[in-house]
């Protein structure tokens, strides 16, 4: 399994491949995206792509993880935030998804492709866990048990 690159040029190449994959999702759909198409769109050879990703699903997993991480970074982790801050966060979340290469298609892909659903679900579990930990630490709702708070956060 290829590791994440550390050098600037390698990081830029990996990002270029992810951007190309996102753009192709919007152009041709997840079924028709191939590693050869992504390599061509990114202006690299297929062996270069395979230096960074084992296969199509490793590439699409990384693409989904990149978007999930960026979205999660926008979520205010202070459970005491007022509604205006939360509403702005949601609008920023939507805008980030729109501006990301293939963003809306990445979200659809994470729901439609069984091999990729875990990317979205693990991201949600991680973020839910962080929100619950902060809420419990602040005693947002004294006396409420952890399982109940996790369910409410997950459904929100």
Regions found by a protein language model. Give the residues of each.
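Helix-turn-helix
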Residues: 12, 16, 20, 24-58
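Hydrophobic alpha-helical connector segments
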Residues: 62, 75-100
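N-terminal intrinsically disordered/low-complexity leader segments
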Residues: 1-12, 143-146
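Alpha-helical DNA-contacting segments of helix-turn-helix folds
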Residues: 60-67, 120-123
């Amino acid at each position: 399994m290829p590791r994440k690159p550390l050098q600037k040029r390698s990081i830029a190449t990996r990002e270029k491949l992810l951007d190309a994959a996102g753009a192709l999702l919007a152009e041709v759909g997840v079924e028709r995206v191939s590693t050869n198409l992504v390599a061509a769109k990114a202006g690299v050879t297929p062996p270069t792509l395979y230096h960074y990703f084992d296969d199509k699903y490793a590439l699409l997993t990384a693409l989904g993880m990149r978007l999930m991480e960026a979205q999660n970074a926008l979520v205010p982790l202070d459970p005491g935030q007022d509604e205006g801050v939360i509403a702005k966060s949601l609008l920023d979340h939507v805008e980030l998804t729109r501006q990301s290469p293939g963003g809306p298609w990445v979200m659809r892909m994470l729901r439609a492709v069984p091999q990729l659903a875990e990317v979205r679900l693990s991201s949600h579990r991680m973020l839910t866990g962080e929100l619950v930990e902060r809420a419990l630490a602040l005693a947002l709702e004294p006396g409420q048990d952890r399982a109940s708070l996790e369910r409410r956060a997950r459904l929100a």
